[in-house]
Swiss-Prot record:
SMART domains: PKS_ER. Disruption phenotype: 100-fold increased sensitivity to acrylate, about 8-fold increased sensitivity to 3-hydroxypropionate. Acrylate is bacteriostatic, not bacteriocidal. Can be complemented by acuI from a number of other bacteria, including Rhodobacter sphaeroides strain 2.4.1 (AC Q3J6K9) and Ruegeria pomeyroi (AC Q5LS56). This is Probable acrylyl-CoA reductase AcuI. It catalyses: propanoyl-CoA + NADP(+) = acryloyl-CoA + NADPH + H(+). Belongs to the zinc-containing alcohol dehydrogenase family. Acrylyl-CoA reductase subfamily. InterPro entries: Acrylyl-CoA_reductase_AcuI (IPR014188), ADH-like_C (IPR013149), ADH-like_N (IPR013154), GroES-like_sf (IPR011032), NAD(P)-bd_dom_sf (IPR036291), PKS_ER (IPR020843), Zn-ADH-like_protein (IPR051397). NADP(+) binds at residues 41, 156-159, 178-180, 198, 242, 256, 267, 313.
Amino acid sequence: MQALLLEQQDGKTLASVQTLDESRLPEGDVTVDVHWSSLNYKDALAITGKGKIIRNFPMIPGIDFAGTVRTSEDPRFHAGQEVLLTGWGVGENHWGGLAEQARVKGDWLVAMPQGLDARKAMIIGTAGFTAMLCVMALEDAGVRPQDGEIVVTGASGGVGSTAVALLHKLGYQVVAVSGRESTHEYLKSLGASRVLPRDEFAESRPLEKQVWAGAIDTVGDKVLAKVLAQMNYGGCVAACGLAGGFTLPTTVMPFILRNVRLQGVDSVMTPPERRAQAWQRLVADLPESFYTQAAKEISLSEAPNFAEAIINNQIQGRTLVKVN
């Protein structure tokens, strides 16, 4: 099988496509023929060695994949069945999806929902799955379309752009925040009623004028602090990212004076039941136009160069890897 293998030499990460024997695949009860994978920011960090994502080498990256079951010792899955996988540390500490085959635990797989195929599943990927979990978190907190505007930070990224599309389809008024002016028209086409520049969120006081009924934050740091200070009474912020940094220079004021909820959202270890629910919702709630968005299709051998481009903020939209 062909695979993108990451090896370490003199402290540097080297990425190359190699032919490997299936016997080298890690332990697991289901072997999958991978048809499509994708390149996420986390994959790009791993492939370029820019982030300490991978501790053990050699490693096959790829935190998402979709394909058909080759062999299964898990009664829930049978040969020929279409499946997808996101998260669970695959592509980080267990060989991942940037290979013609992957062997994983059945618990980590999701049967392909009706109305979805492998390519569409990878257009959604971890980014879209995380966005759906954030929307569900706002719903669970009682945030409704009639309550007011929802702000989405880091809106031109994978999670943010999907969140904008989902919220718009569900009837919410969406305001997008993006540091890239070139993406403003794109965000409006996804459903944002207006787009604010990120530098408006640089500094904040402990409490500011109430503006937002809900928020999905992918940035962290000062941007998240500003959003918290501007939340309506009883509002909820779903926080899922740290594109701007992992610190949070806030105070207790929004929480104790405005009853604001800060809800963390993790997509890696989401329990199977919630996971399946989110994928069903994605099929139902994503507009068909979402799948026609800019999605670059590349081969395994092109992945290292595209990983570099993703790190340098040169790619808009999804990067799909056609594996088989």
